[in-house]
């Protein structure tokens, strides 16, 4: 709702900046998110882009089992948003989605980014237990080694 207020303020003030907000699939279980989404579409806030991290995990388990907001794309479309679905692990898809969102007129845009929680760290991938937990020293070293190896592969 803060991002919606910022986007509305920009529109009313004749400003050209865009507003971006990041939401989790667990977070969008909250009513305030949908009230803001409805308002943003009603006001045609095409300067607003919401990126929804869709990994189906939250601190207490599977998003679908706790309080399912699925199907997310259809819900945002029903609320009057432009929807772009991407793989959150593809830099090309991320870049294209932000470009498309910035060019779309008349509606706010929701980028639904399908992701894997902890991607790139073998013992963290797809585990909700890491939502609010810090790794110990040994785990940290292993995680950094795995991420550095992945980075080296990308740069090769």
Residue ranges and their predicted role:
Residues 1-156:
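Glycine-rich ThDP/TPP pyrophosphate-binding loop and its adjacent helix/strand module
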């Amino acid at each position: 709702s803060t991002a919606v207020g910022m986007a509305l303020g920009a529109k009313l003030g004749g400003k050209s900046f865009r507003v971006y907000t990041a939401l989790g699939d667990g977070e969008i279980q909250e009513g305030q998110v949908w009230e803001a989404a409805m308002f943003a579409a009603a006001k045609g806030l095409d300067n607003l882009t919401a990126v929804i991290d869709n990994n189906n995990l939250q601190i207490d388990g599977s998003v679908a089992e706790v309080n399912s907001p699925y199907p997310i794309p259809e819900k945002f479309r029903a609320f009057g948003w432009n929807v772009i679905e991407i793989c959150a692990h593809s830099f090309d898809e991320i870049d294209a989605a932000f470009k498309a969102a910035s060019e779309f007129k008349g509606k706010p845009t929701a980028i639904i980014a399908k992701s894997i929680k902890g991607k790139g760290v073998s013992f963290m991938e797809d585990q909700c237990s890491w939502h609010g937990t810090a790794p110990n020293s040994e785990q940290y070293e292993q995680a950094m080694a795995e991420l550095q190896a992945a980075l080296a592969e990308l740069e090769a």
